[in-house]
């Protein structure tokens, strides 16, 4: 009887070990942001302070779902994110996802440019496995720090079989948004990210992850060069004289995104500046400052979307300026620069 109990105990231990070994592996790429900040007692303001390992230690329950590998890529505010850092992040994510044992990737990031990084990764990383970005609206010194919950939810999303082939997602406040449409809508509220007309694609509940829909518009654009072409965003507003756009072209910008009005409209000085850029073979993409809706070549007055399109500009479709800039950069570094080819890519 003693022998039987001993054998049973050993068998149970072996079974538990085997179960632990079969837990999915998730790589956690930490880049910084409010989620990695604490209050500095001298400055009396949040500053970068904690690593990915420190954040992981606040979520002991995460081990029930996955084995987490931490890769501390940086610890910077997301305001410091730029194309070189995006290239580094894409390479790290792709390397992790190419490993058969890795189920997916979590990226912690500041919320200010989180939507840009999400879209960049969605365009430049090729895998059926999920990438889930998280951030926090409260720093780690706050009593209501939202970072640990977002990290736990991200792990649950990554290991859920339903999450395959959904591209890059953003998980905060129990909601799941897709990279293409998500945007930050509030400076301080924890429910800051949403996807406008299209809504979030799923939610995280205590018992399971539920998806309501899946992203439909996705494309892959390889990174061909380490250095991205310079693309500037120029804002249209009442009384704009177009000089900022002309100056950007004269300084060597390789592409321009105009944050236009309405469906893609602008005044005559800005329209003339667009034509100036096009005369210098600098592609111009017209987006809008309006949160929802598409840009269309609809209006025929001088500076209306129809006349600007007829002059050679590209309509950004439903991409807002920051994301239109990212797509234009990647297309240009792949040698795609004609109006027809650019328009086809923006329409995908």
What residue spans do the PLM features occupy?
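Short, acidic/small-residue loops that bind anionic groups at enzyme active sites
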Residues: 118-149, 156-159, 279-288
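N-terminal signal peptide c-region/cleavage motif recognized by signal peptidases
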Residues: 15-16
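A glycine- and small-aliphatic-rich helix-loop capping segment at beta-alpha/alpha-beta transitions
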Residues: 42-51, 113, 119-132, 147-153, ...
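Short Gly/Thr/Asp-enriched flexible loops that form oxyanion-binding sites at enzyme active sites
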Residues: 107-129, 266-275
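Internal gly/pro-rich beta-alpha loop/helix module
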Residues: 134-205
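ATP/NTP phosphate-donor binding region
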Residues: 21-94, 292, 315
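Accessory alpha-helical/coil subdomains and C-terminal extensions
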Residues: 23-24, 29, 51, 57-62, ...
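ATP/nucleoside-binding phosphotransfer catalytic cores, i.e., glycine-rich phosphate-binding loops
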Residues: 268-348
